[in-house]
Each structure stands twice: as C-alpha cells, then as structure tokens.
Amino acid sequence: MAFEPSRYQDPRTWKMTPAMIRARRPFFKKNLLGLGILVSVTGGIYVYTHRFLNRDNDFADVPIPPIDPKELEQLKKEYEQHKRDVAARDE
C-alpha cells in the first residue's frame, strides 16, 4: 500500500486526531507570525517593484510637435484603410 495510515489521522475521515491537534498547538502562533512576515515581505517587494516599473516618464521630456489638420486627416484615412485591410485578411 502506498499510503500507510498515520496514527495521527482518523483512518476513515483523514482528519487530525486530538493528539495531533495538541502536538501542533504550541507552534500555531509562531507559524502564523512567520506566515504574516513572509506575506508582508513578498507583498512589499511586489508593490515596490510594480510602482518602480510603472513610472512611465521615459518620454516626458520629448515635446510633441503640433500636427496640421490636413496631415491628421491623412493619418486617419491611412489608419481606417489599414483596419479594413486587416479585417479583410482575417475573414
């Protein structure tokens, strides 16, 4: 048999016996404290990294040139034509 029944588990329900619960009781608070510290450190690193990487100021100093209305219309036409070409190709 691959799994031998443990004397600390009920063989019918596989729940912990009262002896196992008593044996684990002294470590419960320390384990919760350790879990809290681990989750806090991991969460802190995640939040710090997320905030650091999402500073999107790479092009903040690059001025955006004004665009001529005629040029804007031409760009819109090109974009619409590109959308139609992609839609026709995907059909």
UniProtKB/Swiss-Prot annotation:
Cell location: Mitochondrion inner membrane
InterPro entries in the cross-refs: Coa3 (IPR041752)
Predominant place of localization: mitochondrion
Listed GO biological process terms: mitochondrial cytochrome c oxidase assembly
Membrane topology category: Single-pass membrane protein
Gene Ontology cellular-component annotations: mitochondrial inner membrane
Ranges of the Mitochondrial matrix topological domain: 1-30
Coiled-coil portions: none
Residues annotated as transmembrane: 31-53
Keywords associated with the record: Membrane, Mitochondrion, Mitochondrion inner membrane, Transmembrane, Transmembrane helix
Mitochondrial intermembrane-side positions: 54-91
The family this protein is said to belong to: Belongs to the COA3 family.
Quaternary structure, from the entry: Component of 250-400 kDa complexes called cytochrome oxidase assembly intermediates or COA complexes.
Entry function: Required for assembly of cytochrome c oxidase (complex IV).
Record protein name field: Cytochrome c oxidase assembly factor 3, mitochondrial
Organism encoding this protein: Lachancea thermotolerans (strain ATCC 56472 / CBS 6340 / NRRL Y-8284)
Lineage: Eukaryota, Fungi, Dikarya, Ascomycota, Saccharomycotina
